[in-house]
A protein has these predicted regions:
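Blade-level signature of beta-propeller repeat domains, shared across WD40, Kelch, NHL, RCC1
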Residues: 410-433
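Surface loop/turn motifs at the tips and blade-to-blade linkers of beta-strand repeat domains
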Residues: 77-80, 147-153, 193-198, 251-255, ...
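Short loop/turn segments immediately following the C-termini of beta-strands
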Residues: 91, 99-101, 171-173, 179, ...
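Asp-box/WD-like beta-propeller blade repeats and closely related beta-sheet repeat scaffolds
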Residues: 142-165, 170-209, 221-224
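Beta-propeller domain segments
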Residues: 24-68, 105-107, 111-122, 126-128, ...
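Conserved beta-propeller blade signature
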Residues: 93-95, 165-168, 214-218, 270-274, ...
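Residue-level detector of Asp-centered blade-edge/turn motifs that repeat once per structural unit
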Residues: 89-92, 161-163, 208-212, 265-268, ...
Length: 433
């Protein structure tokens, strides 16, 4: 047994005791959801935060997630390597970014345990660093054609096609490539548009503007609450706006700890995003959230959360706290809400206009949250009701194992909802029953 595994087991035992002690402190708080959530008071967990994460099992033959009433689900593509994000091309081809978080050098005993836990959950390991193309040639909802579209990338995540240029969000920046309609691959050399600092929250989501003149990129923080100081966080925890004509870039909005999925609300033209909030303050404190994004807006990280609730663990800046914007809609504590796409009314039978959200699932609370795909209804450009499940059943009944973990969500050319599952290594396809 290696020293790292010994250390991990020691911390796991201590963490298990701490987890049981926290459970004895009282009933679990109610989920913090919606436009006016009840966010429990912070209970800082110090050097040993709650650590609970199911082991990755994957799906058995014939097994699949549970679709909401009126819906059905099938596997569109299988046998991938940690599929994270989805891009659908105009001809219906489906591109899948296959990548993973890469382990850094552990700095503390807790980091040893955290890395061991994440490996067990398949959330840490080798990164395939490729984009794979799938094509459903006969229209039966299952891809028959599989091609390596791009390889040798650097933890690719976000993708976007604007005209004849294909953009990839590598962890260290956005790269542009020439694209030919219907091509099975891109082998040309790319052109880097902007560089980002890698590590930490490593995903780089992309979303073009409706007119194709701008490209938006999500760049998460390096750390949980800027433990290494704000200098190393410069240029992070933000959404960038790239001008595709001039090549210039700027921070469009900041204070967003880890903004991942982005989508346009088509009736208002407003940008929305889902954000993963900080750890170590309790099961529901603070909640992850869905929010509209204002040009020049600041959303609190690291100084405060859910508006202007100060995080006492962080050296404060009163001026920044004073201008922090309260998010629009809470998505529950530590649900790891990553995927986001607009779903027009009628796309899924019985579902009105709204947003589909892929919730990757928690690792740092006493009871698990997330591990599902949910839907938030919209009316007049804003969230208008409680969430509804689209897909569930990603966890074993005892919650010790996960069959899958949803990440990216998007609409296929046939109106189906496609869901990337990076534990099951599947792309799921949701349609009316």
């Amino acid at each position: 047994m290696t020293m790292s595994s010994i250390m991990a087991r020691i911390v796991a035992v201590i963490g298990g005791v701490a987890l049981q002690w926290r459970k004895l402190q009282g009933a679990a708080p109610a989920p913090a959801w919606g436009g006016a959530p009840v966010v429990p008071a912070a209970k800082p967990q110090g050097a040993l935060p709650t650590l609970k994460m199911p082991s990755a099992r994957g799906w058995s033959e014939g097994q699949k997630p549970v679709a909401a009433p009126g819906l059905k689900v099938n596997a569109f593509a299988t046998d991938l390597k940690h599929p994270r994000w989805i891009q659908v091309l105009p001809n219906g081809d489906v591109l899948i970014a296959e990548s993973n978080q890469i382990a850094g050098k552990p700095r503390t005993v807790f980091h040893y345990a955290m890395q061991a836990t994440m490996r067990r959950a398949r959330a840490l390991g080798e990164s395939a660093n490729r984009i794979t193309l799938f094509r459903d040639r006969d229209g039966d909802g299952v891809a028959e054609v599989r091609e390596t579209f791009m390889e040798g990338l650097n933890q690719p995540f976000g993708m976007a096609l604007v005209g004849d240029t294909f953009y990839v969000g590598n962890t260290d920046g956005v790269v542009a490539f020439p694209y030919v309609a219907g091509a099975n691959s891109i082998t040309a050399q790319g052109r880097k548009l902007v560089s980002f600092k890698p590590s930490g929250h490593w995903t780089r989501s992309l979303l073009p503007s409706a007119d194709g003149k701008k490209l938006y990129a999500g760049v998460g923080s390096l750390s949980n609450i800027a433990e290494g100081g704000m200098a190393v966080e410069e240029g992070r925890a933000a959404i960038y706006e790239l001008d595709l004509t001039s090549g210039s870039s700027r921070i469009f909005a900041g204070g967003l700890r880890n903004a991942v999925g982005m989508a346009w609300e088509p009736n208002t033209g407003v940008l929305w995003t889902v954000v993963n909030e900080r750890d170590g303050l309790g099961d529901e404190t603070p909640p992850d959230y869905l929010t509209s994004v204002r040009d020049g807006g600041f959303y609190g990280w690291p100084y405060c959360y859910w508006g202007q609730t100060v995080d006492d663990r962080v050296p404060q800046d009163a001026a920044m706290v004073a201008k922090a914007i309260t998010p629009d809609y809470a998505l529950g504590g530590h649900t790891a809400s990553l995927g986001l796409c607009w779903v027009p009314s009628g796309t899924l039978p019985g579902f009105p206009d709204g947003m589909a959200i892929g919730q990757h699932g928690s690792w740092n609370r006493s009871t698990l949250s997330g591990y599902k795909v949910v839907f938030v209804p919209f009316t007049n450009g804003r969230p208008s009701g409680p969430p509804r499940d689209i897909l569930s059943g990603f966890l074993a009944p005892d919650e010790r194992e996960s069959y899958g973990r949803p990440v990216g969500v998007t609409l296929g050319s046939d109106g189906s909802l496609l869901v990337a599952d990076d534990v099951g290594d599947v792309i799921w396809r949701v349609t009316g029953a």
